[in-house]
Regions:
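A structural signal for multi-pass alpha-helical bundles of membrane permease subunits
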Residues: 5-270
Length: 270
């Protein structure tokens, strides 16, 4: 009985891994093929191995600038989201005030709202202020979604820190900024890592706002990938290569914060 159960679990695990890995493998496989081979021959690996698709990405400014633009506004958004979320999460975790639960619920409601709901207001506002097609436009728009999520994650980690630590620091003569930066934040560095990861990933993959609020100068890679149709048709090989390179930053970030994410799952905040 135990052996049969183990075999079933192993089978389900193998099937799940195949289901999860197959699309990634197929994209990598396509990235090393020519368009003719992609459209004409079914093969599990490239018959005519080529790096040309990746050469296009690294030499064509319309492609590699998309990665640069994405990194710029993702870095801005992640940093600003954490700077805004840290004091807010501390207030929710340490103080009770009139309407605190309602404010917290309102924050989470913003996070659960589809980006399309806010698209028209952002478009009109940025057009009026002259912020269209700028990195700051996308970064600020994503704050509406990342700050509530970061507050929710950080509040859970901060609530797990005993209040006695705050009181002891104040008795020892620590000012609040010094206590918060040198004592409190190191205690919740796992939460900061988890919050930064989710802020990064949302901004990195979000398409609707990034595509609508930019056109040329600040167009991110996710928007660039939706505009690959030329007179000769869809360039599938280049699109696959762009997809592979788009996965790489997320994979690197996951590698560095994997332990923090596991801790977040254990605390029920991820």
């Amino acid at each position: 009985m135990a052996e049969s159960r183990f075999q079933k679990r192993t089978l389900f695990l193998v099937l799940y891994l195949l289901f999860a890995i197959l699309p990634v493998y197929w994209m990598v496989n396509m990235s090393f093929k020519t368009n003719e081979e992609i459209l004409g021959v079914f093969s599990l690996w490239p018959q005519a191995f080529t790096w040309d698709n990746y050469k296009v990405i690294f030499t064509d400014a319309s492609w590699y600038s998309g990665y640069i633009n994405s990194l710029i506004y993702v870095a801005i958004n992640t940093a600003v989201s954490l700077l805004m979320a840290l004091p807010a999460a501390y207030a929710f975790s340490r103080y009770s005030f009139l309407g605190d639960k309602h404010v917290f619920f309102w924050l989470l409601t913003n996070r659960m709202t589809p980006p399309a709901v806010f698209l028209l207001p952002f478009f009109q506002l940025y057009t009026t202020l002259g912020l269209m097609d700028t990195h700051i436009a996308v970064a600020l728009a994503h704050l509406l979604f990342n700050v509530p999520l970061a507050v929710w994650i950080l509040e859970g980690f901060m609530s797990g820190v005993p209040r006695e630590i705050d009181e002891t620091a104040y008795i020892d003569g620590y000012s609040f900024p010094r206590f918060f930066l040198t004592i409190f934040i190191p205690l919740i560095k796992a939460g900061v890592g988890v919050a930064a990861f989710f802020c990064f990933m949302f901004s990195w993959v979000e398409l609707l706002m990034a595509r609508t609020l930019t056109s040329v100068n600040a167009k991110p890679i996710v928007a660039t990938m939706t505009r690959t149709v030329s007179a000769s048709g869809m360039d599938w090989g280049v699109l696959a290569a762009a997809g592979v390179l788009t996965i790489v930053p997320g994979a690197i970030v996951i590698w560095f914060v994997r332990n923090y994410i596991a801790k977040g799952f254990a605390m029920g905040r991820v």
